[in-house]
């Protein structure tokens, strides 16, 4: 069994400076007052255009970012691979609003696929749909509202680009994670990913949807998806996470006067997350998963489930992932 308390193994690839920087950053971020003060100072510095790029790159950027460009990330990719850790290149673009931005995200995603081709160091490619289409269009689709002529033209271009991305990923056999986003556009995302799964996940799992378990409806969603997949003869891919928009979800629900879609207690999110792992492992013959968590208990629980079901640690239907610098 893996021992997460073995810091000698966990940090064997880190220099003393790396460990000191991480300790300093996390210690600082652990104090809200200090964290807010430094954030306010940073805003003033940026407003005054005082050059501090070098300082950010040595601290926050170095801890949490692999690089500014794909080629710039190669050193981080190689370093992680020495510890048998793969890299998921995430082109951080969401909420784009104009055609030039969509085209740029599309082109960058294809570049990532080119680099990931035949490269075992990069097992997946990930992107957000809001990097390829306006947020408001996904919002309208989620509410089943009619699109304007211009929005329909944008949707057609989006579908063509998404088809090109998925067909290229299929050709080079490189799975895709499509990130979850806010609940008021997630229905459209779910529907789009569902169609892609039906098309590309017949023999293997190429397309993964992301399920945010802080939403109290997601366990039911993935169970229903599993049943439909078995009935219609395709496999499903799921990246299971706790969620990224908790405060935003609560604030909007209270403002608009609808039921808050996320769990009030973290313990309920933890419970649903672990139940999702259990369900997926019990249905591993048609479900591939990526457990996206920094939580030790959930990570240990996944290993326990695998052992109980006689699943090898290197089974390619099961991955675990963390954000760079967070584990």
Annotate each predicted stretch with a short phrase.
Residues 1-327:
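Positively charged, amphipathic and often flexible ligand-engagement surfaces
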């Amino acid at each position: 069994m893996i021992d997460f308390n073995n810091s000698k193994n966990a940090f064997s690839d880190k220099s003393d400076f790396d460990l000191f920087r991480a300790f300093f950053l996390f210690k600082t971020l652990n104090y809200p007052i200090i964290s807010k003060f430094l954030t306010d100072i940073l805003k003033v510095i940026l407003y005054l255009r005082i050059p501090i790029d070098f300082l950010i790159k040595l601290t926050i950027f170095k801890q949490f970012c692999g690089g500014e460009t794909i080629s710039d990330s190669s050193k981080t990719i190689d370093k992680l691979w020495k510890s048998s850790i793969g890299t998921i290149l995430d082109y951080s673009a969401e909420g784009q609003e104009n055609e030039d931005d969509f085209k740029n995200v599309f082109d960058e995603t294809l570049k990532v696929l080119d680099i990931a081709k035949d490269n075992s160091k990069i097992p997946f490619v990930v992107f957000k749909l809001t990097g390829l289409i306006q947020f408001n269009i996904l919002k309208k689709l989620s509410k089943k509202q009619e699109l304007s002529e211009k929005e329909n033209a944008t949707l057609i271009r989006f579908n063509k680009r998404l088809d090109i991305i998925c067909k290229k990923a299929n050709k080079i056999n490189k799975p895709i994670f499509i990130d979850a986003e806010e609940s008021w556009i997630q229905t459209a995302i779910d529907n789009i990913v569902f169609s892609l799964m039906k098309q590309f996940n017949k023999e293997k799992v190429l397309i993964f949807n992301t399920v945010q378990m802080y939403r109290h409806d997601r366990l039911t969603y993935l169970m229903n998806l599993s049943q439909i997949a078995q009935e219609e003869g395709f496999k499903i891919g799921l990246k299971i996470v706790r969620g990224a928009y908790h405060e935003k979800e609560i604030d909007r629900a209270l403002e608009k006067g609808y039921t808050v879609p996320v769990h009030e207690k973290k313990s309920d999110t933890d419970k649903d997350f672990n139940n999702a792992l259990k369900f997926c492992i019990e249905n591993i013959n048609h479900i591939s998963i990526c457990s996206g968590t920094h939580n030790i208990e959930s990570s240990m629980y996944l290993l326990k489930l695998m052992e109980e079901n006689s699943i090898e640690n290197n089974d390619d239907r099961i991955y675990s992932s963390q954000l760079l610098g967070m584990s």
